[in-house]
Amino acid sequence: MPLTWKDSGLRWYWVVVLVFLADQLSKQWVLANFDLFESVQLLPFFNFTYVRNYGAAFSFLSEAGGWQRWLFTIVAVGFSSLLTVWLRKQSASLLKLNLAYTLVIGGALGNLVDRLMHGFVVDFIDFYWGKSHYPAFNIADSAIFIGAVLIIWDSFFNSQSEQDKTEEVK
């Protein structure tokens, strides 16, 4: 018998909504309060700096001429759809994987909306040391990164033992 939404990982979809809203609200705040490249120092190693990212992580393909917008749109929709199908098929009790998948989906959808609305992703979190700046990023990027780390962690350390525990409960 297929899992109901309450019993499946779809029960965790509230994380997608939370990440998406936090990401979009923070980006709207930046767009309303900052000029492009404007920077406000918050700590001696941390700024809010409004930049536009036409590429992917670390501005990968940002100078590609525009076609990458549609490639990244297809990738975001594809991965979000795939992870949603996986959430539907797995137990709600797989905490780490469900959290990981929903973080990635929320982040992917947050950046997808930027690409579709603006043609670029709004980045503003700027960490630096001296004159060396880490590439600016946003809440969606952070969620995707944390989700990816959790997926990798789970694949090396926990997936089989958590699956065994879930099957024992049934």
UniProtKB/Swiss-Prot annotation:
Pathway the protein acts in: Protein modification; lipoprotein biosynthesis (signal peptide cleavage)
Active site, UniProt feature: D123, D141
Residue spans crossing the bilayer: 12-32, 67-87, 93-113, 137-157
Cysteines joined through disulfide linkages: none
Gene Ontology MF terms: aspartic-type endopeptidase activity; endopeptidase activity
Domain of life: Bacteria
EC number assigned by the record: 3.4.23.36
Enzyme class of the recorded protein, top EC level: hydrolase
Catalytic activity: Release of signal peptides from bacterial membrane prolipoproteins. Hydrolyzes -Xaa-Yaa-Zaa-|-(S,diacylglyceryl)Cys-, in which Xaa is hydrophobic (preferably Leu), and Yaa (Ala or Ser) and Zaa (Gly or Ala) have small, neutral side chains
GO terms under biological process: proteolysis
Function of the protein: This protein specifically catalyzes the removal of signal peptides from prolipoproteins.
Annotated family: Belongs to the peptidase A8 family.
Protein name: Lipoprotein signal peptidase
